[in-house]
């Protein structure tokens, strides 16, 4: 049941229980409390047992569709249909700085889209801090031209005003849902800003390495030119 005007959207899937606990712990510690957690459950068993540990969170659980892209589509459109004002994305195998929702909403006062910095970590701990700040300064405006051949917008480090978004339809086999979504929004003249005082802690492990490059045994986000297999927004 909807209780707030801000939705935090994620998809859960079979993974280590600790990943999901880390995710929900970070949401329960947010400095801003007035948000609903929308969860598309793609075959994670016994989620109820974990949910009941977080009674302070308003968790709305949804069924899954047949592909990851369609799960994203379903979750986004649900939030539109429920008339949420703001939508914050986060992957359920990541976790977030305590101020992420607060600072994202603050930045959305004057922007349509907010993208925050990421720190990369694995089982050994954090190995790259504020990764995007290597190339971007805080409060940098991000243009359509900037993401023509690269992507900084993930579905774990972005937030949007939902009134800029129509009902979405993704091809069921679409891989780069994030790039496709945000490239289309920027082409339609939505404005976006990068902030680095809110952090997504982006977990790197063997099942979460699509689109990453390996350097000295560590995975890094892919800043280089997108290949022709990506779905273009013409």
Language-model features: where?
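Conserved nucleotide-sugar donor-binding catalytic segment
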Residues: 10-11, 138-215
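Glycine-rich, basic loop-to-helix element that forms the pyrophosphate-binding segment
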Residues: 63-79
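Short, well-formed alpha-helical segments that are part of the catalytic scaffolds
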Residues: 15-29
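Catalytic core of nucleotide-sugar-dependent glycosyltransferases
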Residues: 202-205, 211-234
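Acidic donor-binding segment of Leloir-type glycosyltransferases
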Residues: 28-61
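Short beta-strand-to-loop acidic/aromatic patch adjacent to the donor-nucleotide binding site
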Residues: 84-95
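Conserved donor NDP-sugar-binding/catalytic core segment of glycosyltransferases
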Residues: 99-129
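Hydrophobic targeting segments
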Residues: 4-10, 24-27, 36-40
């Amino acid at each position: 049941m909807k209780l707030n005007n801000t939705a935090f959207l994620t998809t859960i899937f079979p993974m280590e229980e600790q990943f999901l606990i880390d995710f929900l712990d970070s949401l329960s510690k947010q400095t801003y409390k007035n948000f609903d957690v929308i969860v598309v459950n793609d075959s994670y068993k016994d989620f109820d047992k974990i949910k009941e540990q977080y009674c302070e969170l308003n968790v709305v659980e949804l069924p899954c569709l047949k592909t990851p892209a369609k799960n994203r589509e379903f979750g986004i459109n649900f939030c539109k249909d429920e008339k949420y004002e703001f939508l914050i994305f986060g992957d359920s195998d990541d976790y977030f700085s305590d101020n992420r929702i607060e600072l994202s909403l603050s930045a959305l006062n004057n922007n349509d889209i907010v993208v925050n910095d990421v720190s990369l970590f694995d089982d050994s701990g954090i190995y790259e801090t504020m990764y995007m700040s290597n190339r971007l300064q805080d409060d940098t405006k991000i243009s359509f031209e900037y993401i023509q051949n690269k992507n900084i917008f993930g579905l774990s480090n972005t937030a949007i005003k939902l009134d800029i978004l129509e009902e979405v339809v993704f091809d069921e086999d679409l891989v780069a849902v994030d790039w496709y979504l945000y490239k289309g929004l920027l082409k339609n003249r939505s404005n976006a800003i990068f902030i680095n005082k809110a952090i997504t802690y982006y977990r790197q492990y063997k099942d979460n390495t699509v689109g990453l490059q390996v350097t000295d045994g560590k995975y890094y986000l892919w800043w280089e030119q997108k290949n022709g297999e990506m779905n273009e927004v013409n």
